[in-house]
Amino acid sequence: MNNQNVDQNEIAKFEALASRWWDPTSEFKPLHDINPLRLNYIDERVSLAGKRALDVGCGGGLLSEGMALRGAHVTGIDMGEAPLSVAKLHGLESGVKVDYRQTTIEELARDPEHAGQYDVVTCLEMLEHVPDPASVIRACASMLKPGGHMFVSTINRNPKSFLFAIVGAEYVLNLLPKGTHEWKKFIRPSEMSDHLRHAGLEVRELTGMTYNPITKVYKLGRDVDVNYLMHARDTRED
């Protein structure tokens, strides 16, 4: 495990909470709240129906199931055994078919049955939890078909994100369990763009995601100071 791009402490955080993944009133409420926004953002740009999609860091399967319900053929990967068990069980209960696997993206990229075979790769709310995000992005890019699309989301690294994403979300509003995030692991959009370009992808769009603590509503917009999504594309001919 030492040579894998995995932080066991990060995995342990989500293992401990896994049984509550599909409870929209639990610690995962923020994920439930933003999932429709993320899903629509992706579907509007690639039209998921009939596409082959890979969800990297799928956790309990919220996004994976959502993409499958939009008609995509989805593979979801994660290194957390408990979240994957929850994802598989929920899929059986809901009748939504997703191929879940316990593996890292770097390992899957070495499998010729998967490398270069996906129209869409998503890596949402995951990159701030791994030791080497650039390695993840390179491996994700290698999974794309020519002309394929990649979507990433994470948290910006600046004083405002420390105030909002850690102090506010974890200690004041109690939206997330304390210790969910480490500020030093947050990734600036400029850094994310560099990672994507070095992986051979063209950045197409940067979009912010904000939370209003009064209305308790998330929305997409231009403010990328805290949470943001980025859309990139493989530049090879389809």
UniProtKB/Swiss-Prot annotation:
Classification via Gene3D superfamilies: Vaccinia Virus protein VP39 (3.40.50.150)
Catalytic activity, reaction form: a 3-demethylubiquinol + S-adenosyl-L-methionine = a ubiquinol + S-adenosyl-L-homocysteine + H(+); a 3-(all-trans-polyprenyl)benzene-1,2-diol + S-adenosyl-L-methionine = a 2-methoxy-6-(all-trans-polyprenyl)phenol + S-adenosyl-L-homocysteine + H(+)
Keywords of this entry: Methyltransferase, S-adenosyl-L-methionine, Transferase, Ubiquinone biosynthesis
Metabolic or biological pathway, per its Swiss-Prot or TrEMBL entry: Cofactor biosynthesis; ubiquinone biosynthesis
Gene Ontology MF terms in the entry: 2-polyprenyl-6-hydroxyphenol methylase activity; 3-demethylubiquinol 3-O-methyltransferase activity; polyprenyldihydroxybenzoate methyltransferase activity
Catalytic EC class: transferase
Record function comment: O-methyltransferase that catalyzes the 2 O-methylation steps in the ubiquinone biosynthetic pathway.
UniProt record similarity statement: Belongs to the methyltransferase superfamily. UbiG/COQ3 family.
Protein name, as recorded: Ubiquinone biosynthesis O-methyltransferase
Organism, as annotated: Marinobacter nauticus (strain ATCC 700491 / DSM 11845 / VT8) (Marinobacter aquaeolei)
Gene (UniProt): ubiG
